[in-house]
Amino acid sequence: MELKTYLREQIDWELPFPPEEYAERRKKVRSAMSDAGVDLLLLCRLPDINWLTGYDMIWNHLRNSTTLVVRADSDDTLFFDAAAHTTIVSLVPEIRDAVIFDHDPMAGAGDFDIIADELAGRGLTDGTIGLQFWGWGPAPTVIEALAGKLKGKGAKVVDASLLVETQRIYKSPREMKVVRQAAAATDTALEAARTSMKPGMTETAIEAVLVASLMEQGCNYPAIHTMVASGVRSGTHHSPPTHRKVRDGDLVHIDVCGSLHRYHVNTCRTFSIGKADNRWLDVMERASGSIDAIIENVKLGDALPRVDEIANEHIRKVGLEDDAWWIGGYPLGISFPPDWTGAHWIHWNEEVFGPTPEQLTIKPGLVFNYENQFDIWEGWPGGTGCNFIETFLVTDDGPELLSRLPRTILSNGD
């Protein structure tokens, strides 16, 4: 089945980035491929495909065979996808050469034979081919099956799971602009949620206000479900909103990412219905200094774990170490469900967090969040925990805080 490229003449909405942005990204990847000795790169992870082409879709199931092929020796790319996505692919100007499987259902048994045969027919299976064995995408057994087909055509297959992710860690000026827009939208949405809260309102209704505000500003669903937790649930982590109705005196924590063109900015704040107990306010005031310490002490060129050292030292200094569930963070960028984290974390640990090739450094374009999460089971009125999360954008001047919201506990009436 052929691309319906005539549909591109009917694109009447603004695309996220101009062609030259994608060309610059491909150039970076091709250079990294050459450095790694990879002749051909087959990408099945949607964040990487999106970053290189602008392709976007919502169903990356475990047998999915959507694949972008990148060559080290040429700017030519090749795209494979299912017949069901013919219109989607046809509306992506950066996809110029594609093989559309002419069968349904998606990911038929012969898809990988088609991919291997097509690549061999173009003389592209004689060298080293990189595949993505790690990360969200097709299951490892599916990638192994693809690897077997390529080996059968004479290719040497290597793991290149993070080759593209490592390139997209540091954002371009155009990407940084999108990140700033996502941050502003997130602040606006959190303020809308805060001012809408009132006793008797369910957590799901609070989320509805938050999501509606984000959508009205052009954002879409984030890669992780928004977290809203109130009262006795305020100390929960990674918990979706429930039908619980908020009450006077409750703490309400909201952890959300604004997702604009799939670029994520993470902000969390703890609010209160009425005035919060002074002990909660004291915890947040003492913890807030960890963010100030990052801004004051983290310098360009530092290893990323330096952020962790500085913030955790502040938490120890102000006596909150025993109450902290987690003080830490990770880089952010393009993400698709079910996760907005990647292989790189601030507290770098290769054994625990996957095949991260090296520690990152603080350089312009890096975007990362930082979390202060506290569990307190002392029977204080209002809840079982409080927290905040900030997102930083590193510029030529160092880490810049993106949110303008205070890190104290604002009430619904403030």
Language model feature labels by segment:
Residues 1-414:
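Active-site neighborhoods and metal-handling regions in enzymes and metal-associated proteins
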